[in-house]
Structures are given as C-alpha cells and as structure tokens.
C-alpha cells in the first residue's frame, strides 16, 4: 500500500509537470513559462517547459492530496498528460491579466487621411506623437493656381511738375518751397496700388508615406503704371523744380510761361514684381489630420522700377541765340532692377477639421541682392532753320550721374502666408489666403534722382563750372508686399 501511494505521488508529479509545460508559471497573481534544462527532464531530447510556483505546496500537502485522491499508475507515465488537480493549480481565469494591445493598422498608400484611425483611438490624433502613413491629404502630386490681389511698397518720387499762378515772376515760377507754387506730380509715392497677379505651386512626394518631397512655385504681379501729363500753349505756368547747385537756392526749369514757352510734360513711373523658388520638403511630425514640414531650398525675387520724364517745348520768342520757333525734346530716364538670390528655410503647417482646413507658412531667405541702376538723359534741339542737334543729358540726368551701375549687397527676405479652405472632393480643394513679404536693401528708381543741378551742365554746355551735380548717390530702402489670394488645389 505504501509503495502504491509513492507511485501515485510520482505519477501525479509527472502529470503536473507535463500540464505545466503548456501553462504559465504563477507568481502571486502572474504566471510565466520558464525553460527547464535537459538535466532536469531526464529522457527528454530537448529542454521542455516546467512549472515554478511561488509558495509551492509542501511534500506533506502533496502526500495529503495523494492520500485523498489516489490515481492508478498508467502504463506509460511519461506519455499520458492529465490536467492538474484544482487544489494544486490556481484558477487562471481569476488572475489579473494585461488588456490586449490593438495592432497597428496597415494602411495602403493613397488612403484618404480622414478615414485612417489612430493609436489614440480617434480619427484625428491629439498630438504629433504618432505618424500613420500616409501623412496629410491624399495624392502624391499636387498643383495649385492662385489669383493674387497684392499691393507693394510704392517708390518715392521727388516733385517733378509744379505750377504757379499767372503773373508770378519768372524767377519764382514753379519754385519750391513757395506759397504760390503747387505740386502737380511727385512729392509722394507711386506704384503702391493693389494689382492682380498669379501664383503657380506644384510638388511631388518622393515616398509613399508623404514624408519627403520637392515643391516649386512661381508668381508675378501685373505691372503698376502711374502716368501724368500736362500741357499749355503758353497761357499757364508749368515748371520742373530743382535745387541750383551754383546759387545754393531752389530753382525751376520752365515748361510753359506766358510769352516765353509753350510745352507739354509727361511723366511715367512703372514697377513690376516676379519671384519663385524650389524647396525640399521634410516632414517633422504628422497625424492623419495635421502635419508640420520643414522647408529648405532656393529663392529668387525681382523688383524692377522705371521713371521716364519727357518734355516737348517750343520757344515763343527769341532768347539770345535761340530763335523763336526752336523746339526742344528733353528726356530723363531712371531705371533699377533688383535680383535677389538666396537660400531659404522655413516651416509649413496644416490642420484639418473635417472638410475644412487652415494652414500657415513662414520662411526666411538669406542671400545677395544684385542692384542694377541705369541713368540716361538726352536733349534734342531743333531750330526752325537749321539741323537738329542732340546732347547728352536732360535736366536731372547729366554727364555727372549718367551711367550703368551695378552693386551687390546682403539682403534678408522673410515671408508669411496664411490660408483657410474647404476640401471640395477627395482630390480638390479651394482656399483663400493672406500673404506678407519683405525684402531689405532694395534700390528704387525714384530714390536715385538727385535734384541738385549745376545749370552750366545743361545743353549746349559751352562752359561748365562748379560742382559735378547731379551726382550718382545710390540709395536703398525696404520693400514689402501684402495682400489676399484665392486659389484651387488639385492632387493626383
């Protein structure tokens, strides 16, 4: 009987070990499998799983179990497996367990971002900690077109045309400052009006997850033109003011004066703006409803200005060697071009709320602005009985400042863009935006005009004395653009 009990205990121990090979190990309230060595499992070809239990039952407890619940010895102890008695193995179902972890969803490229679930449990993740491809809106290629309604900083114009009441002494006619002189054109800014324009954007993602890409853009504003024209048959006073460098006093050139001259004066200021660039796009963080991208690349920007002043005069009476009927054509031209080339770095962010979205873009470009300044002038004299003659120089453009000038300076160009829109379809959206752009060290045509004139340089220039004025005195200023835009974007 004693031998039978011992065999029963051995059989029970073997069965328990065999069942435990498929059960976790119990530590308090946690079970875990532990590899047993081959030495601990005689007759086994490879290590098996054994059971280790904290607070395991004692030999006495095992004997009590064997005494109360004897088990006949099977023919092959090692081949039969029976479940362990409930008194030995605890109820696994009663132990605490870790909640199952939801697997990361697999998303095929091109799946609409709004339909992608996130690990946070919603359609839109609250933070940028999880990036489930593809990030952002669908489509690997995008292109957009925007109508621009922007205004640029106008160029400053000095007083170009003045008038005085009839009867004003010839030496004071059109002279500034004078209580009887009014400015007809100039003395303020020109080309600061809102103008229409167009901007084209496009890009492509280089990977299926929309994390790396290339984008490019180009824009232009329609040319701004500010024109002025006046004329008189000699019944009114029209003048062009300047500062006499010989006398050190304000002075004026007559365009029309009763009994002396009849003439016309036209002045035109023009301005144009174009720009563009190419950027690499590197995603910093994203979730199905928002993304933040790093931008770095190349930026180009051009601002061009021109001022053209023309006079057509006819002498009404002879003055010295000038017979009556002599005609004059006087031209002054000032032109500037600014070509900025630089490297740009910035951020682009977008957040989506269902079918609506908002975005912001900020960047700064550092580089070189090449300033090109051209000053030209000519005077043509056509006597009534004689050959026409042409002279270099007009009034404000004289041999002392006429020329082609080139200079390169360091410049900074920050840019800010905001937009909000609606996702019309999965592949199309419309939006409205606001844009601001700044460029430092810009040469404007109006700033290159020097009102100091040495009258001895005026044609026919028989004897030149005194200072070489007007002079080339380059000036630079700040340039800004701001305005609104409406656009449509397509993705493929």
Residue spans of the language-model regions?
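Intrinsically disordered, low-complexity segments enriched in small/polar residues
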Residues: 6, 12, 26, 41, ...
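Outer-membrane beta-barrel transmembrane strands
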Residues: 24, 85, 89-90, 95-158, ...
């Amino acid at each position: 009987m004693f031998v039978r009990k011992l065999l029963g205990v051995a059989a029970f121990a073997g069965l328990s070990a065999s069942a435990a090979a498929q059960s976790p190990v119990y530590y308090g309230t946690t079970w875990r499998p532990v590899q047993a060595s081959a030495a601990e499992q005689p007759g086994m070809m490879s290590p098996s799983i054994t059971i280790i239990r904290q607070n395991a039952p004692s030999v006495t407890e095992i004997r009590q179990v064997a005494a109360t619940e004897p088990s006949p010895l099977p023919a092959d102890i090692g081949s039969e497996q029976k479940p362990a008695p409930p008194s030995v193995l605890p109820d696994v179902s009663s132990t605490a367990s870790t909640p199952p972890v939801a697997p990361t969803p697999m998303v095929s490229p091109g799946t609409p971002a709004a339909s992608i679930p996130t690990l946070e449990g919603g359609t839109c993740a609250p933070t940028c900690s999880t990036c489930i491809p593809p990030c952002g809106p669908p489509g690997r290629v995008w292109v957009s077109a925007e109508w621009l309604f922007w205004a640029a900083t106008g160029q400053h114009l000095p007083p170009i045309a003045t008038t005085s009441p009839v009867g004003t002494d010839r030496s004071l006619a059109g002279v500034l400052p004078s209580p009887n002189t009014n400015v007809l054109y100039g003395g303020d800014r020109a080309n600061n009006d809102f103008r229409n324009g167009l901007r084209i954007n496009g890009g492509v993602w280089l990977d299926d997850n929309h994390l790396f890409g290339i984008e490019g853009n180009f824009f232009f504003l329609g040319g701004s033109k500010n024109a002025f024209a006046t004329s008189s048959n000699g019944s009114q006073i029209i003048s062009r003011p300047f500062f006499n460098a010989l006398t050190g006093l304000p002075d004026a050139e007559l365009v029309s004066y009763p009994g002396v001259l009849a003439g016309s004066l036209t002045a035109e200021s023009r301005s144009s703006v174009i720009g563009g660039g190419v950027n690499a796009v590197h995603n910093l963080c994203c979730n199905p409803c928002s993304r933040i991208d790093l931008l770095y690349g190349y930026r180009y920007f051009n601002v061009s200005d021109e001022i053209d002043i023309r006079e057509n005069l006819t002498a009404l009476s002879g003055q010295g060697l000038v017979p009556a009927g002599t005609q004059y054509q006087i031209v002054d031209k000032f032109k500037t071009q600014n070509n900025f080339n630089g490297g740009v770095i910035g951020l682009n962010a977008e957040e989506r709320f269902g079918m609506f979205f908002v975005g912001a873009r900020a960047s700064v470009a550092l580089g070189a602005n090449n300033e090109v300044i051209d000053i030209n002038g000519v005077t043509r004299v056509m006597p009534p009985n004689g050959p026409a003659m042409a002279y270099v120089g007009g009034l404000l453009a004289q041999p002392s400042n006429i020329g082609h000038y080139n200079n390169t300076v360091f410049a900074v160009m920050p840019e800010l863009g905001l937009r909000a829109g609606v996702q019309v379809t999965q592949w199309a959206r419309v939006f409205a935006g606001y844009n601001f752009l700044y460029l430092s060290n810009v040469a404007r045509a109006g700033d290159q005009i020097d009102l100091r004139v040495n009258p001895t340089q005026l044609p026919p220039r028989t004897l030149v004395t005194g200072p070489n004025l007007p002079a080339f005195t380059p000036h630079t200023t700040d340039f800004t653009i701001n305005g609104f835009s409406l656009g449509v974007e397509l993705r493929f």
